[in-house]
Amino acid sequence: MTGQPLLGDLLTLASDALPEVEALFETARSALKERVTTDGKVSSKALEEEQFAAHALSWLATYVESLRQMRAWAGRLETEGRFGEMEALILQIAFGEYLAQIRGGIPMSQTETARVQDIGIELGHPGEAVRRLIQAGNTPAARARLVALMRDNHGRATFGASGLDEELEMIRDQFRRFADERVAPHAHGWHMRDELIPMEIVEALAEMGVFGLTIPEEFGGFGLSKASMVVVSEELSRGYIGVGSLGTRSEIAAELILCGGTDAQKAAWLPKLASGEILPTAVFTEPNTGSDLGSLRTRAVKDGDEWVVHGNKTWITHAARTHVMTLLARTDLETTDYRGLSMFLAEKVPGTDADPFPTPGMTGGEIEVLGYRGMKEYEIGFDGFRVKAENLLGGVEGQGFKQLMQTFESARIQTAARAIGVAQNALEVGMQYAEERKQFGKALIEFPRVAGKLAMMAVEIMVARQLTYHSAWEKDHGQRCDLEAGMAKLLGARVAWAAADNALQIHGGNGFALEYQISRILCDARILNIFEGAAEIQAQVIARRLLD
């Protein structure tokens, strides 16, 4: 291992490299847009035929935005006098690696690599800043020095300053302690026994304000920022993704009601959601529809002052012991697309293990799953299930899909935050094992490839963090952020899976044993590329947004 680990003019190099990759992205976007445009509009058929190129563009855009946010993060820290050696190494390795991948190939999955040639453009010679960062950014010396600093900073919530303000870091500390004391010691047992998260944990979260975190104070919540929601989700998911996901249900339900509910619905439902008095579940997906929500077939027919629901739903998280369903159903039976869908706040009686669905008109059964346990997944059948007419969201039919889309930004930001928490957990577990496990007379962490895995985990977690924090900042400031939130979710899910897989690899054969918690973390990480929009769907949505 030779050479100095840290480049002397790093911030200047990073600034100088950005215009080159931004120009590359614009060239790629123009080239693809020309191929998929018919009569002045982007053709859905042509875009599908060019799907690989379109998704390559999405990943290229995600990398460019990630580097942009990393440079902005470094600049803020530099101004505040907090840009130290660890932060500099993280920035340098991130730029070195991501620039190399932009020019050589970005992994979309284990067997799919996105290259700019797929989009139909040729690469020229790199500029001096890009060349230097690729050549000397992500080096063995840089990775080794970063891991040495990480070992000197055991117990820190993040490796490298997060860039968040003191108030948000205080929130992080509070929930980190809770996760360490009340969640992490029991998470593996809950997973292995496939148990629901105990109600005392749910009640403790309610007392801490998790379910009303972003609900306005006038409705009984704390009125905090989406950034605070991100930090809370990160830390709880670091303890156990199931616990970190409990707040997601309330976040989605509250956002639906805030954006689309009547004044009476807001007054009736939001205080109870904020306090945790009622627990909600999202009931959208149907068998054979997956992400194609516009083709839902569950129907609701008006009968006096009630709606009568018939149909089937699947992959419903935390369905049994909740009190209300945000239920998407077709009220205009003449339609076959999203225009005939309506959203309901459908009340139900919480179930038990012995009788999960006691409400008349409802039946259901558990779907056994690989990971992401703790709330359980269910199939539900509706046969004459009744909903009060006053519980039609907004009091207007046909607005369900539009109302749901208004929640997508927050949902994707929250999912990205959960991914960061899972990745951070994998890093901490992998690093602890690498320091404690001895082979050939020394700790595993002393071997360069093991240390290198840990270094790249820390770097990519910070990249995902900055992209997610930026999305939350945009949301908090009233800016449209569906594109950035989608990118954060797309990248965060890949980072979590890579971190879990590499941490398990560090464990060797022990990682394959169920008794080691990394086996659970791997299973939990796998869902992040699937739910809330599979990676392929997410890339398609991003591409469409970039090209429109």
UniProtKB/Swiss-Prot annotation:
PROSITE patterns: ACYL_COA_DH_2 (PS00073)
Record: residues binding FAD: 282-291, 315-317, 437, 505-509, 534-536
Obligatory cofactor(s): FAD
Range of residues in the leader sequence: none
Residues annotated for substrate binding in this entry: S291, E409, S410, A411, R412
Manner of cofactor binding, per the entry note: Binds 1 FAD per subunit.
Active site: residue positions: E532 (proton acceptor)
Keyword check for Magnesium: no
pH dependence: Optimum pH is 9.2.
Swiss-Prot/TrEMBL keywords: FAD, Flavoprotein, Oxidoreductase
GO molecular function: acyl-CoA dehydrogenase activity; FAD binding; flavin adenine dinucleotide binding; oxidoreductase activity, acting on the CH-CH group of donors, with a flavin as acceptor
Gene knockout outcome: Cells lacking this gene are unable to utilize acetate or acetoacetate as sole carbon source, but grow on succinate or propionate plus bicarbonate.
Catalytic activity: (2S)-methylsuccinyl-CoA + oxidized [electron-transfer flavoprotein] + H(+) = 2-methylfumaryl-CoA + reduced [electron-transfer flavoprotein]
The EC number(s) this enzyme carries: 1.3.8.12
Keyword Kinase: no
Domain of life where this protein originates: Bacteria
Function field: Involved in the ethylmalonyl-CoA pathway, a new acetyl-CoA assimilation strategy that operates in a number of bacteria and replaces the glyoxylate cycle. Catalyzes the oxidation of (2S)-methylsuccinyl-CoA to yield mesaconyl-(C1)-CoA. Highly specific for (S)-methylsuccinyl-CoA.
Subunit structure of this chain's protein: Homodimer.
PANTHER family according to UniProt: ACYL-COA DEHYDROGENASE (PTHR43884), ACYL-COA DEHYDROGENASE YDBM-RELATED (PTHR43884:SF25)
Family stated for the protein in its record: Belongs to the acyl-CoA dehydrogenase family.
Record's protein name: (2S)-methylsuccinyl-CoA dehydrogenase
Organism: Cereibacter sphaeroides (Rhodobacter sphaeroides)
Upper lineage: Bacteria, Pseudomonadati, Pseudomonadota, Alphaproteobacteria, Rhodobacterales
Gene: mcd
